Amino acid sequence: MSYELLLSPMKIGSMTVKNRTVMTAAEFSLGQTDGTPTQKLMDYYEERAIGGVGMITPGICRVNDMGAASTFTQLSMSRDYHIAPMHEFAERIHRHGAKLCIQLHHPGRQGYSSSTNLLPMLIPIVKRFPKVLDMLFKCTPFLLGMEEKGIIWSVQAPSKCELANHGAMRVHAMSRREVKNLINDYIAAAERCKKAGVDAVELHGGHGYMIQQFLSPNTNKRTDEYGGSFENRMRFVAEIIDGIRDRCGKDYPLIVRLTADEMYDRIGMPGKGYGLETGKRIAMRLEELGVDAINVTSACYDAYNYWLEPTSFEPGWRKYLAKEIKSVVSIPVIAANVMRTPEQAERQLQEGCQDFVASARSFICDPHWVKKAEEGRENEIRRCIGCLNCIRSFMTNAKVGKQGECALNMSVGREKAYFAQERDGEDRTAVVIGAGPAGLTAAQTLARRGFTVDVYEKAEKAGGQVISAASCHLKDKLYWCIEDLMTGARNDGARIHLGSEMTAAQIAETKPDVVIVATGGQPLRPQSIPGINNDNVCLATDIINGHKKIENSRVVVVGSGITGLEVTEFLNDWGCNVTVIEMAPEVAPGAWFQLVDDEMERIKPFGTKFMTSTKLTGIEEKTVLTENAKTGEKGSIPADAVVLSLGVRPVNGLVKELAELGISAVAVGDAGSSGTIADACHSAYDAVMNIK
């Protein structure tokens, strides 16, 4: 396909970007406490520049050290000592023809008081005693517990307002002096960016952060000149823009990332915050103020799934927002619209939805997708499946001193080593049993190391349990990972044999140097429970895979994990009256909250009943017997059918059989320990890289 617009240059103010692609900011905790870029951070972004992106906006960059921190390891432009390291970073991006844009950020009410208040003290201490940070991360559970109880520091917000869904438990209204100081912090940070050779700055006015908090009537209840009317709510960002223009000049490219619609109506709160019409009005005012481009986004932490979408959201679903903003401004419009393929990107440019296509997750998943599109190698692009592991891992790992990671791209945060992989496996052979995500990741990693690799999958179709997952409502994109892992493994030299089951004896005959067992898991059906094998009992996978259909019946689903919620969707569609029981005290224990919210949004309209802290003790012909996990109280639920969704147990008997023949094998993925697609891929990669 010809990418006439996607690969064409375009100007943002005085800056010419070589193509229409922008990597948007996504924090990954690759920095360090003092806010200077690490080699690892620069390697990470330079690889995206090598891969052809037009402009890179690294993760959020704090504008001061007292109040503006979101993590202990993000970028900062709060001090003059940041200028020289940032200059080095910019030079590395410029080597490959890309532009560097720094996003200036303050979390406001969506910050965590431990990071915003401890950081000033930590910076000088950690410089002298680096291990102090490790000690702090060990205290994270205690600090978060204190924060949840609201008994430690508060964070800044435009006014005393309700708490965000995720963030601090105490906020305080900024004084007028604090507002003025923060405006000056933004301006000074922008000036340092210009001195460092950064090509552009972006003010983060989206996703519910500080600038948006001033713009929104939901969070701005001030009665002075910074609150009340539309013009007053615009004053905070207007004074920042005026100050940047005064210090950096009118030709220095300035972008605002703008939430065009706070999306409260999507989460059942119509009338709260502001909608698209106000978003358009803000955009027009920003153009009047001299902004060079608007980067259109949506929502805030309260409506998390409407800016960090799970896989159920259609690629491009947000393009109407960009098109509406573009209809009222003449400056370039950048937009991230769940962009997943170059074909989609070109199409949205041709439709006039936007001038630049933006994405963070697509560049996280495949740093070279632009170059691959340019060279006609689209089939080699590793597409983001929207599993949200990058978000989950960052938000979880940042609290304990670790980096974020991608479910499918093993190079994240180790680019130098990954792309300089030594082919130390040549003249050695490897057999991989199973072609799910773990088996295919193992195969590609082995092939990249130079092994001669054969993958054997007994089914006629690769994918393992991903086949079931991709069969669920709006989850078909999950199968992309199998298609792309297959392509990657084959391109690196692995041979994949479908419909080929191998016994231990047959494997032994090939005399492999390495054996990887990726035979997946089997759904649990605890035989200790009376009635577990009754005719009215089936497994969740029986329904998801189309082997069984239950209509217009009373059904009890046992287990409220993501699979349990997915099977509930099927049953609701088939007219069933569903009760979900869960032994844990909450629904979907351990599952990432966005995935749970996504499922529950589709389940709630059907009136499904959830019973937590409830153990299954027996199954009769028309009754499910239960026990309260807290009180021991016995109970019963009328039921025509029971669906079990209790997780999986590893299927790895082949490891023992091979051991009896004197062959060592490593179990990966669900064959080693049940988990997510990300768990499967990373366990396989780590296992292969540990082979000497």
Task: Report residues per predicted region.
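Flavin-dependent oxidoreductase catalytic cores
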Residues: 1-433, 437, 442-448, 453, ...
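Flanking helices and flexible, charged tails adjoining ferredoxin-like Fe-S electron-transfer domains
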Residues: 241, 415-425, 430, 441, ...
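Short, structured coil segments at secondary-structure junctions
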Residues: 329, 352-353, 492, 533, ...
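Small-residue-rich anion-binding loops in enzyme active sites
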Residues: 368, 373-385, 500-522
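Rossmann-like dinucleotide/flavin-binding elements
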Residues: 424-455, 497-511, 519-593, 627-641, ...
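Rossmann-like dinucleotide-binding cores of NAD(P)H-dependent redox enzymes
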Residues: 452-492, 569-614, 672
